[in-house]
Amino acid sequence: MTTILKHLPVGQRIGIAFSGGLDTSAALLWMRQKGAVPYAYTANLGQPDEEDYDAIPRRAMEYGAENARLIDCRKQLVAEGIAAIQCGAFHNTTGGLTYFNTTPLGRAVSGTMLVAAMKEDGVNIWGDGSTYKGNDIERFYRYGLLTNAELQIYKPWLDTDFIDELGGRHEMSEFMIACGFDYKMSVEKAYSTDSNMLGATHEAKDLEYLNSSVKIVNPIMGVKFWDESVKIPAEEVTVRFEQGHPVALNGKTFSDDVEMMLEANRIGGRHGLGMSDQIENRIIEAKSRGIYEAPGMALLHIAYERLLTGIHNEDTIEQYHAHGRQLGRLLYQGRWFDSQALMLRDSLQRWVASQITGEVTLELRRGNDYSILNTVSENLTYKPERLTMEKGDSVFSPDDRIGQLTMRNLDITDTREKLFGYAKTGLLSSSAASGVPQVENLENKGQ
């Protein structure tokens, strides 16, 4: 069976991931007019820039959908977002600022839940608005086929007939108007935005040029913290975790994770927390650039890692970071539910997150400027009395430390012998000044 259909399958049911925007509206109407039977599926991911979700399926029916469904994906999205925080599943960082993989998390959820809904309706052909140069075309492909092994893919934006007729936004707008729909193009921004309740991605157009900075972006989840005219008073906030799960903000306990994430977004958003500028490597190995917002994810991540460093030992923390980066890359590639990702997730959630219980108090200021004011946990292995310089009872004595240092003589001797061995082979040069072979100064050799 052919997995990817290059031309419209006339007379067959096609499920389209319908956003209600110009692209998917024109595609749905065009498919109906050309003889296909389109079904519209809209994912409610809690997008901060979407005002009326209920209106989207109604518009789809007006444009010719055989049926239109709104699928509430918010609970699952937040669950996956919390799992990513527990695992540190983030691999793109610049100067200490993190991209929280919010778009890949959204695709993992919508890509599986929409196809599952289509399968319920007997729809086994799926289309969406992803382009052939991006990451989403592969993410949706993987998640779709994982959910429905019989799935076939039809994308209007890969169909030359569709492209020839409606290849641009102007043509699509004219097509909608000619068909009796007063569809005006939205005002063109200097960049494109994709969002869900975990975060927002701003990219393309002017942002493709590295001399266009974050200052051209109008945040949809936060504030322009770089604008000195924007008043942002400092704010204290407490975040509580129980066994790796965020349960309370500022003393308010949440039984609904969706409401908790919305409140975390509001708190972090007031300061522009979690906004970053990243150059990343797409799945196809080409580099792209994005400006990201994730105020709630950033707030939870900071508190989680503060507790992590106070509870776990060095080797566990090292494995958390190493495996988290590996898992973040798998998530980015659309492999969040692959076996290698599940193995890493299970290990990190079972042996790391389960011990993260406690409360962190922060002072948020502008952007990513914050201070940690207090850390409290019954599981802390940070115990100041162990290392206090004040006189009193100690868990070990000076003689104990002398013995420990003496034991180091073994590996120090081995290391010294290795260094002189490297010098004999020419990898290092002998140094009379230090007595230790060193890397030769290339400047002295005129190189």
Swiss-Prot record:
GO cellular component, one term: cytoplasm
Native species: Escherichia coli O127:H6 (strain E2348/69 / EPEC)
Entry keyword set: Amino-acid biosynthesis, Arginine biosynthesis, ATP-binding, Cytoplasm, Ligase, Nucleotide-binding
Alphabetized PROSITE patterns for the sequence: ARGININOSUCCIN_SYN_1, ARGININOSUCCIN_SYN_2
GO MF terms, alphabetically ordered: argininosuccinate synthase activity; ATP binding; protein homodimerization activity
Annotated L-aspartate binding sites: 131, 135-136
Family of the protein in this entry: Belongs to the argininosuccinate synthase family. Type 2 subfamily.
Protein name: Argininosuccinate synthase
One GO-annotated biological process of the protein: argininosuccinate metabolic process
Domain of life: Bacteria
EC number assigned by the record: 6.3.4.5
Subcellular location(s) of the protein: Cytoplasm
Complexes and interactors: Homotetramer.
Binding-site residues for L-citrulline, renumbered to this chain: 99, 135, 139, 192, 201, 203, 280
Reactions that this protein is recorded to catalyse: L-citrulline + L-aspartate + ATP = 2-(N(omega)-L-arginino)succinate + AMP + diphosphate + H(+)
Pathway: Amino-acid biosynthesis; L-arginine biosynthesis; L-arginine from L-ornithine and carbamoyl phosphate: step 2/3
CDD domains: ASS (cd01999)
Binding-site residues, ATP: 17-25, 43, 129, 131, 136, 194
InterPro entries from the UniProt entry: Arg_succ_synth_type2_subfam (IPR023437), Arginosuc_syn_C (IPR048268), Arginosuc_syn_N (IPR048267), Arginosuc_synth (IPR001518), Arginosuc_synth_CS (IPR018223), Arginosuc_synth_type_1_subfam (IPR023434), AS_cat/multimer_dom_body (IPR024074), AS_multimer_C_tail (IPR024073)
